[in-house]
């Protein structure tokens, strides 16, 4: 008699480059949360839960590298609980949680609070800590203490570190415990009041623009600092063609550099804001069609490692206002993977999408990578 906790997934095609069953159509038997058998055909029994999906696929559980669940401080936008539900509904089994909240997540106790709030949920949450105390960009936070509590990465997120000396100290300090420093590349001094990408569209709309230069200067600075300190850095979301080229050069120089972009930057561009659509207002801004194409090519060539949702929810009443006063950011974790499957398969194969939305994020964070193989935990997305 089979255990009632068994789940039999019928006739799905495996998409997992680390699995011996990659691109094969199989049945997968899950027993007590572990993959117990994979075969071309497994006989079902009455007390098994049977899962059948027409033309279905199974891949390692997706991981959303950049999400903001807004708790504590902005629970009216979203809570950890509702964020978990959104991520699971989007097919994710893990997320990286951004720290720039009110209060900033800059101490061991804040990391512990986040971990405790997520206990007992099927979603793996890796909270990021801030680089600086209070996220104010002036003094290093308690990075190692936060690391011991479960923070694997550090970033000031929406308040990018403007002080080169602080970034240098962060990269140097993180080397002591193999922590990851994440940069959101934006030199705010270039265009502190920008609303969207600076170009033909912003001029036609009469809006202050954010030039690609603001991103590219910051990337050049942080790559130089990383090289000097022999450190490790990840650029969270890049948006321009020149950024792709600069990071490609750094990888060719064997620097420990990785980067990601958002699903929105791969599918849309600044022309989609022509009707003042606040849903497309984000940081970094959507840039030109040429930049959009360069990002896709960057993924194909392995320069861009991660596709993230860049999930930043806001309540409707502050979104449905005039474009200049609408906040940056929008929802994403519940729709990022469906968007990728709908809009990107003409450019990227499914295995590449899985790598950038499951395997690569976990590799960069140095956390366990799910594998579709007998004896491994059933951390899967169907």
Feature-to-residue mapping (PLM):
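Alpha-helix-loop-beta-strand connector modules within alpha/beta enzyme cores
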Residues: 108-124, 172-183, 335, 339
């Amino acid at each position: 008699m089979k255990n009632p906790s068994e789940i039999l997934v019928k006739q799905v095609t495996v998409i997992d480059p680390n699995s011996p069953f990659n691109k094969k159509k199989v049945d997968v038997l899950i027993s007590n949360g572990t993959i117990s058998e994979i075969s071309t055909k497994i006989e079902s029994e009455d007390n098994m839960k049977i899962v059948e999906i027409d033309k279905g696929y199974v891949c390692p559980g997706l991981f959303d590298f950049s999400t903001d669940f807004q708790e504590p401080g902005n629970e009216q936008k979203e809570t950890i609980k509702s964020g978990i539900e959104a991520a699971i509904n989007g097919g994710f089994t893990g997320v990286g949680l951004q720290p720039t909240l009110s209060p900033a997540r800059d101490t061991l106790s804040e990391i512990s609070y986040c971990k405790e709030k997520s206990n007992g949920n099927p979603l793996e949450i890796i909270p990021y800590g801030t680089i600086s105390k209070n996220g104010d960009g002036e003094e290093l936070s308690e990075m190692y203490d936060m690391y011991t509590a479960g923070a694997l990465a550090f970033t000031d997120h929406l308040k990018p570190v403007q002080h080169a000396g602080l970034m240098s100290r962060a990269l140097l300090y993180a080397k002591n415990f193999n922590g990851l420093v994440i940069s959101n590349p934006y030199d705010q001094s270039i265009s502190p009041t920008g609303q969207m990408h600076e170009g033909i569209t912003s001029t036609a709309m009469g809006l202050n623009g954010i030039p690609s230069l603001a991103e590219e200067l910051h990337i050049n600075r942080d790559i130089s600092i990383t090289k000097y300190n022999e450190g490790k850095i990840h650029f969270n979301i890049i948006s321009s063609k020149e950024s792709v080229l600069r990071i490609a050069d750094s990888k060719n120089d064997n620097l420990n550099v990785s980067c990601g972009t958002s699903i929105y930057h791969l599918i849309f561009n600044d022309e989609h804001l022509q009707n003042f659509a606040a849903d497309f207002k984000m940081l970094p801004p959507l840039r030109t069609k040429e930049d959009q194409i360069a990002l896709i090519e960057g993924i194909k060539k392995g320069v861009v490692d991660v596709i993230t949702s860049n999930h930043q929810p806001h309540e409707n009443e502050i979104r449905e206002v005039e474009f200049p006063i609408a906040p940056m950011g929008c929802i994403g974790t519940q729709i990022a993977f469906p968007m990728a499957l709908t809009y990107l398969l003409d450019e990227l194969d499914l295995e590449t999408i899985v790598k950038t939305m499951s395997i690569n994020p976990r590799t960069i964070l140095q956390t366990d990578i799910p594998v579709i193989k007998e004896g491994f935990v059933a951390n899967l997305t169907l």
